[in-house]
């Protein structure tokens, strides 16, 4: 974390993946390092030099859970100032590549990784604002639509709103 002259943290860009399985469960991880140590979240982390947003999201999900995913649309952009950190986080909808191999294994800076039903979300101490992001993403995705901004030219660098009819 970089600190500016006035002792405020420089914003860091991060990514996270909202991943559902065939049983309509969400992939959650429990952080074992600050910020949000002990809280449940979705897999994610900071970009590394030279990475695209999509590459970073795929890498973070793999590093933290062992699962391979295909990163789809942007479903949320959140800003968090917590425990001396300042993050701007881009949340993506991500789909499992190998649905037969969907058992998450906690790795990296994660103490636990598991599939959780939406009905059980209230039983988990989630990071701020996450429950609403999960539920909104699920409602749109379950309705047969891919939520959020989409990748215009399939390069993982330019995302726009889908076409909308303003009648």
Task: Indicate residue ranges for each PLM-predicted region.
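A structural signal for short, well-ordered beta-strand segments
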Residues: 17, 74, 92-94
